[in-house]
């Protein structure tokens, strides 16, 4: 079947999972499905469409509404007829169309059950819960209960308080991953933990042992035993204790012995050892030479190197430490829940957990679940590859008991090749599992689309050639790897000459500032495009954009651009002014912030007036001084008018302070002072509202937690809504997902991001021959290896590396007609890319390009202005009538 026929099939009243590449119109298909279902349901609320971002939810709902209002559309006519028959009045009751984020859906569930939710009322949701995490850890470490566990943890981590504190705080942000496991650990004996851990090690070593027995015959195994007995007799090694061993048992107890064998046969660089000496335990005599030759005569057994990563069998001490760490983590989680309840605030993890609890424990359906089941008949999930385990468990409970015969359907749409939200706990293996096993009890028929309606054939062909070499040939669930599925361009091209793909290889001399020179190169590249062409510049992280943005601001000010969520709120002068107003209103003695509000644009006192008022009085408060008529008579008439206006507004606010929530009080003062009139860009009001929302969630009716406010404004980013005149847009790749642009430039290919801290505990679950291996390990304070934690963490790193490949795929598939990749390297003795960079993935394809170009020392560019005033954001001083 072609794509058109498959899209038609996807509208049938059955359950499907649709796998479709970038630019294939997935959201449009889901919209069609929603509209089709509206023609058969009894109530619109029976259909629930779920996305993972507010933006996607609002866009999808807007599309559905637009289609319903298309009077000539067959869908619209049928839906409106159904609406009239059933009394929906859908045209005037658009809120009955249930399109929302997964977090909003969970929140709605929780809001129906305030008693079960343990919150008492509908909680606020915070996007920046870090301060809650920090406080919960602080309270746990200062508590008297659990002191023995705290001692064990601190002893294990060498009493490094800062490191322990930082890692515990980090664990709070992923507590849904470990809470269940930690609860289970605290109920197990040391013997159980040791037995399960060693069984896991045997599970990992079994394939290595099988390979040894397949590659080495009995004579060669006997030679190895003889070599070991000889080395034990020389007393030159301390790591061989055979105890009359005459054969190999191939069990977990032998892991250290096989690791010793790898040290004897291989160098630290994992190459076969040619020069065997006394360092390996061999004497320099005839007998020693015999056993050296036995080593040399062994066949190629490089596969044995894998056993180097296997740790020694677990011990009683290990089990004790693991339980203590689990207890501390659970105490932190308990304190966090108490803090959430006190503040009536939760994070997204808490919402999903409360929702899961509310929907029944131990798979028993609660009354609420039965109620929801009655209401919901069709579940549609967009971007299904971004689902986390917690979300998936929640959704499975929603559809618990559904059967195909009941005319209830599930419709999942997504592209595993665009799964890039691991940092939000998205698990791409869920998509793969659902294709294979269905959604809970509902089997899903797979629909595979191939057409791309976004990109030109030139770009599609290049992307296919690149990613067929980068992504694997088959899905590897444990490693979080998804196979590459080529797609085809369905775009009608009027002029194929307009489309282009180019890789820019830049090699610089050692003395060059690569970031600055690459920024110049990209500026020159932008100048080559027509002025009416929209350009997107995409990078892995915000920091990769900073040099280019600063360069344009300073030297190319005529290039109009917007940078989407690149700068934090605390970088916005208007936000700083409102923050000063907040500090000042709650503390009359805060001289610095009172002076700041006098200088703010909505007050606008000149420096000369400030000097006259305050230079001789360092003890009175600012509030007292500005109400002193003698001192006020010394300043300019304009200054007096401005200050008297400020006093009138503040006096009114202070009189009503006890009657109004502090957020509303400060917001009304700012508005009355003319704060909105002083904004340089009218769109700035969006970010001002973000600040006031932070103030709301960080305050009681009469007080503000300023430490929390200051923290949150560093973690919340400016919106920068694009205007028509801004032809250049800067995005991180994650922010650009779902968007498309005429021209895409991907610079900083050789840049990397900071490695994440090791998690305090990690877990792995694998199934072999119907046996489930579920293991948890804790991190070690030193770099000695191997550790069980490092072994499992290695699997985690593989998943991150595979996601990084998909991130590049997402970036490249944003382009419609032009795609430019820019990579820069330093010319040294050896030209090579940075590990864990986009360029390292592309090196096998484009690496030779860097050897074919002459090293650059400096790139010429036409600088428009270097005046510092062009670099400083403009402020507007309020004009008094």
Show which residues each predicted segment covers:
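Anion-coordinating catalytic cores for phosphoryl-, nucleotidyl-, and glycosidic chemistry
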Residues: 548, 566, 795, 800-812
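Conserved catalytic motifs of ABC-family nucleotide-binding domains
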Residues: 756-795
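Accessory alpha-helical DNA-binding modules that contact the DNA backbone or grooves
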Residues: 616-649
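Conserved motor-region signature of P-loop NTPase helicases/translocases
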Residues: 1-62, 66, 131, 135, ...
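Core structural elements
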Residues: 97-107, 156-177, 325-331, 346-351, ...
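P-loop NTPase Walker
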Residues: 1-117, 222, 234, 243, ...
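Conserved ATP-dependent motor core of P-loop NTPases, especially the RecA-like helicase ATPase domain
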Residues: 2, 11-18, 51-52, 68-254
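Conserved ATP-driven helicase/translocase motor core recognized via long
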Residues: 21, 167-346, 520, 546, ...
């Amino acid at each position: 079947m072609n794509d058109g026929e498959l899209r038609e099939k996807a509208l049938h009243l059955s359950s499907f999972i649709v796998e479709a590449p970038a630019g294939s119109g997935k959201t449009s298909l889901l919209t069609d499905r929603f509209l089709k279902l509206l023609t058969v349901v009894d109530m619109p609320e029976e259909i629930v469409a779920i996305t993972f971002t507010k933006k996607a939810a609002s866009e999808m709902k807007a599309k559905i509404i637009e289609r319903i209002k298309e009077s000539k559309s067959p869908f619209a006519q049928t839906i409106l007829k159904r609406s009239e028959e059933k009394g929906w009045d859908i045209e005037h009751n658009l809120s009955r169309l249930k399109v929302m984020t997964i977090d909003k859906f969970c929140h709605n569930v929780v809001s129906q059950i305030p008693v079960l939710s343990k919150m008492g009322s509908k909680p606020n949701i915070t996007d920046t819960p870090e301060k809650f995490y920090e406080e919960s850890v602080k309270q746990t470490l200062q508590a008297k209960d659990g002191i023995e566990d705290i001692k064990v943890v601190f002893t294990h981590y060498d009493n490094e308080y800062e490191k322990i504190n930082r890692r515990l705080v980090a664990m709070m942000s992923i507590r849904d991953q470990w809470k269940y496991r930690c609860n289970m650990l605290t109920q197990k004996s040391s013997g159980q933990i040791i037995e399960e851990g060693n069984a896991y090690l045997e599970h990992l070593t079994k394939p290595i042992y099988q390979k040894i027995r397949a590659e080495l015959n009995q004579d060669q195994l006997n030679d190895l035993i003889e070599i070991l007995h000889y080395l034990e007799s020389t007393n030159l090694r301390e790591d061989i204790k055979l105890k009359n061993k005459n054969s190999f048992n191939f069990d977990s107890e032998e892991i250290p012995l096989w690791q010793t064998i790898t040290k004897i046969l291989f160098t630290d660089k994992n190459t076969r050892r040619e020069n065997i000496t006394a360092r390996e335990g061999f004497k320099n005599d005839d007998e020693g030479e015999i056993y050296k030759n036995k080593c040399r005569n062994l066949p190629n057994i490089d596969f044995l190197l894998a056993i180097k990563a296997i740790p020694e069998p677990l011990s009683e001490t290990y089990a004790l430490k693991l339980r203590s760490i689990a207890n501390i983590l659970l105490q932190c989680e308990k304190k966090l829940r108490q803090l959430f309840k006190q503040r009536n605030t939760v994070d997204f993890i808490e919402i999903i957990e409360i929702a899961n609890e509310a929907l029944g424990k131990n798979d028993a359906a609660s009354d609420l679940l039965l109620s929801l089941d009655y209401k919901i008949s069709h579940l549609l999930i967009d971007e299904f590859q971004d689902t986390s385990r917690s979300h998936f468990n929640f959704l499975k409970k929603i559809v618990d008991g559904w059967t195909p015969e009941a005319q209830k359907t599930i419709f999942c749409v997504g592209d595993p090749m665009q799964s890039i939200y691991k940092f939000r706990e998205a698990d791409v293996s869920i998509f793969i599992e659902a294709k294979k096993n269905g959604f809970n009890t509902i089997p899903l028929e797979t629909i595979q689309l191939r057409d791309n309606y976004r990109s030109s054939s030139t770009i599609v062909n290049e992307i296919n050639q690149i990613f067929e070499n980068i992504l694997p040939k088959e899905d590897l669930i444990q490693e979080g790897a998804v196979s590459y599925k080529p797609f085809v361009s369905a775009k009608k091209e009027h002029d194929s000459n307009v489309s282009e793909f180019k890789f820019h290889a830049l090699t610089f001399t050692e003395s060059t500032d690569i970031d600055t020179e690459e920024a110049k190169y990209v500026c020159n590249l932008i100048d080559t495009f027509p002025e009416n062409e929209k350009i997107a510049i995409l990078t892995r992280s915000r920091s990769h954009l900073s040099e280019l943005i600063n360069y344009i601001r300073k030297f190319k000010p005529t290039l109009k651009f917007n940078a989407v969520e690149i700068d934090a709120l605390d970088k916005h002068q208007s936000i700083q002014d409102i923050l000063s107003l907040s500090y000042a209103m709650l503390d009359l003695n805060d001289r610095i912030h009172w002076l700041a509000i006098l200088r703010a644009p909505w007050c606008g006192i000149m420096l000369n007036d400030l000097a006259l008022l305050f230079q001789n009085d360092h003890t009175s408060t600012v509030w007292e001084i500005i109400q002193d008529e003698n001192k006020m008579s010394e300043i300019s008439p304009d200054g007096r008018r401005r200050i008297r206006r400020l006093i009138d507004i503040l006096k009114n606010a202070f009189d009503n302070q006890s009657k109004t929530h502090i957020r509303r009080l400060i917001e009304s003062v700012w508005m009355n002072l003319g704060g909105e009139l002083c904004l340089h860009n009218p769109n700035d009001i969006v970010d001002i509202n973000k600040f006031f929302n932070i103030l709301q969630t960080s305050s009681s009716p009469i007080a503000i937690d300023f430490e929390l406010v200051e923290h949150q404004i560093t973690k919340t980013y400016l919106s920068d809504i694009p205007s028509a005149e801004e032809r250049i847009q800067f995005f991180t790749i994650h922010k650009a997902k779902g968007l498309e642009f005429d021209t895409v430039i991907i610079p900083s290919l050789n840049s990397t991001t900071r490695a994440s801290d090791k998690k305090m505990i990690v877990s792995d679950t694998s199934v072999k021959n119907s046996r489930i291996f579920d293991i948890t390990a804790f991190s070690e304070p030193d770099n000695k290896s191997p550790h069980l934690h490092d072994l499992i963490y290695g699997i985690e790193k593989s998943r991150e590396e595979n996601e990084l490949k998909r991130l590049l795929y997402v970036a490249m598939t944003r382009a419609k007609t032009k795609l430019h990749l820019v990579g820069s390297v330093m010319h040294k003795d050896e030209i090579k890319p940075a590990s864990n960079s986009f360029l390292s993935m592309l090196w096998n394809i484009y690496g030779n390009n860097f050897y074919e170009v002459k090293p650059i020392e400096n790139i010429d560019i036409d600088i428009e202005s270097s005046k510092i005033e062009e670099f400083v954001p403009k402020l507007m001083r309020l004009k008094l009538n």
